[in-house]
Amino acid sequence: MRNNARARRVLLSLFLAGAAAVACPSAHAAPPPPHTSYWRERASFFQAFAAHADVAMVGDSLTDGAEWAEMFPGLRVVNRGIDGDTTRGVLDRVDGILAVHPKRVFVMIGINDFADEHRTVDAVFRDYSVLVSRLQQGGASVVVQSTLPCNAARAAWKSCKAVNPRIQQLNARLAALATGSTRFVSLSALVAPDGGLRDDLTFDGVHLNGRGYQLWKEAIAPFMP
């Protein structure tokens, strides 16, 4: 009988623990996925080559795919974008960004948090806020750029329609970070009336063509040091 009673207590404990986990899922948030080999290669490169720069451009594939030094030839600009990166990924490599002692850091990140990791707006904004704080503590002024949406008609992944509303919500909250040495730049010139990326600025629904990068440059040029 004592063994049966003990078994019942164990089962009850397991049931209550499971119920608590269901009731409070945030207490057991999924860990971030491991970094890709490309992420590790790029982050390692950034650590190995840390020449001083006026500006660091930080982000995911949209940032990674641009030739920023050619776009702003009068400034020492380094590309610190990594294809597929997320807010958590950027937080993991802040030291490599600050190693170039940038006067100003331009950040645009977030779409992969929603599309690949299915995170909430609250979680992404929380990480974004920590990122801005850490960059400021490292001596850089920060320019937060609105996160660009995707084009649902052209994007290969079907979740684009679900991602764009979350990007809009994130951007509304990012604008509130513009205090003190932090500025916010809206890239609304690249966004269509339906809230997606403009048809004429992308071939695959996510990444920009040359005209898209021209408009991006025009939007941020006034904020260059």
Per-segment meaning from a language model:
Residues 1-56, 68, 99-100, 157, ...:
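N-terminal secretory targeting modules
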Residues 30-32, 76-80:
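Short, basic, glycine/proline-bearing loop/turn elements
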Residues 39-44, 86-92:
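N-terminal post-signal-peptidase region of extra-cytosolic proteins
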Residues 58, 63-78, 88-127, 134, ...:
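Oxyanion-hole/transition-state-stabilizing segment in secreted/luminal serine hydrolases
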Residues 80-85, 188:
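Short beta->alpha junction loops
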Residues 93, 124-131, 163-166, 170-174:
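A general structural detector for well-ordered alpha-helical segments in enzyme core domains, enriched
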Residues 138-140:
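A short helix->loop->beta-strand "cap" motif at the edges of active sites that frequently abuts
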Residues 149-225:
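Catalytic His-Asp segment of secreted/periplasmic serine-dependent ester chemistry enzymes
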